[in-house]
């Protein structure tokens, strides 16, 4: 069983504290495997291998654009999180899967999750040997006209409630997307769609991946993403489509279920998972648990999937 919480728009520090709480509870086997989905306000995170020189912008410029900076314990270099980007934080005990997973196998599964999401939007994506993340290799410029490789596109979900309503008890804002300025980016054949950076402590994972959906790609001009000079792209830039984060979240949750051979259970509230005394350090409101409409609660049950 993997329990899913949608935190909606949530500042990085709050989401990080929640991760840390869940990691400790997972180590004690007091919570199941948990998958957090979140959209962050603009923020740069620096992993253990980060070089400050990969932040190109001055601190003054970052402040003027409302970009926070956090140094964290995940692997990797510097990356950007912001509106229009789907971030996933799996809090998994790798020993709970059959067969149990090693760190490399786990990262490869995250890459496979991302590649299958991209395939849903008819984007051909691949790994690059010696690197972590998911890339697209195109022989023609990306389409910006709303048509994707000759295939019709129908949104999978436009729901604003149910399992995709931000779970109460952490952050209450709905997921939104920002306009993109990706048209300014020069076409190249090799572009990065998603970044991965994880941390594993006593077999329990934290941090995860960030998939650019409708992200304003100009923010990546502030850094050398992951210490690489290769360009960054998004689902919107590649296809001309603007799927909601809720829609992509639905695809992601089902794909996690398939690849990790687990039931996926959407939760209404953080308090469905963590006793109230354990949420004090996350600055979480404790008095307004979310209650989804009955039809959306039915969707949540339908999303329980056993591969």
Regions found by a protein language model. Give the residues of each.
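Catalytic cores of Mg2+-dependent Asp-rich isoprenoid enzymes
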Residues: 269
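N-terminal lobe of the biotin/lipoate ligase/transferase fold
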Residues: 1-165, 170-190, 218, 243, ...
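A hydrophobic, small-residue-rich beta->alpha segment in the mid-to-C-terminal subdomain
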Residues: 214-260
């Amino acid at each position: 069983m993997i329990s899913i919480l949608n935190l909606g728009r949530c500042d990085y520090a709050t989401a990080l504290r929640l991760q840390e709480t869940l990691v400790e509870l997972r180590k004690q086997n007091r919570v199941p495997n948990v998958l957090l989905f979140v959209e962050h306000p603009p923020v740069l995170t620096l992993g253990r291998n980060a070089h400050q020189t990969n932040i190109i912008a001055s601190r003054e410029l970052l402040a003027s654009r409302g970009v926070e900076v956090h140094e964290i314990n995940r692997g990797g270099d510097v990356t950007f999180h912001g509106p229009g980007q789907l971030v996933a934080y799996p809090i998994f005990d790798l020993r709970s899967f059959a067969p149990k997973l090693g760190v490399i196998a786990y990262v490869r599964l995250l890459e496979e999750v991302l590649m299958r999401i991209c395939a849903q939007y008819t984007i051909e994506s691949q790994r690059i040997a010696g690197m972590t993340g998911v890339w697209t290799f195109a022989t023609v410029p990306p389409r910006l006209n709303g048509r994707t490789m000759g295939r019709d596109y129908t949104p999978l979900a436009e729901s604003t409630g149910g399992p995709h309503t931000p779970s109460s008890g952490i952050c209450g804002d709905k997921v939104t997307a920002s306009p993109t300025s990706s048209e300014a980016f020069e076409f190249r054949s090799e572009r990065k769609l998603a970044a991965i950076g994880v941390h594993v402590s006593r077999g329990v994972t934290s941090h995860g991946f960030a998939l650019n959906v409708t992200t304003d790609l100009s923010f990546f001009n502030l850094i050398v993403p992951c210490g690489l000079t290769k360009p960054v792209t998004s689902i919107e830039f590649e296809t001309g489509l603007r799927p909601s984060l809720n829609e992509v979240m639905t695809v992601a949750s089902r794909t996690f279920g398939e690849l990790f051979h687990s039931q996926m259970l959407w939760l209404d509230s953080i308090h469905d998972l963590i006793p109230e005394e354990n949420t004090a350090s996350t600055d979480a409101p404790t008095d307004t648990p979310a209650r989804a409409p009955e039809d959306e609660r039915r969707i949540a049950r339908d999303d329980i999937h056993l591969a």
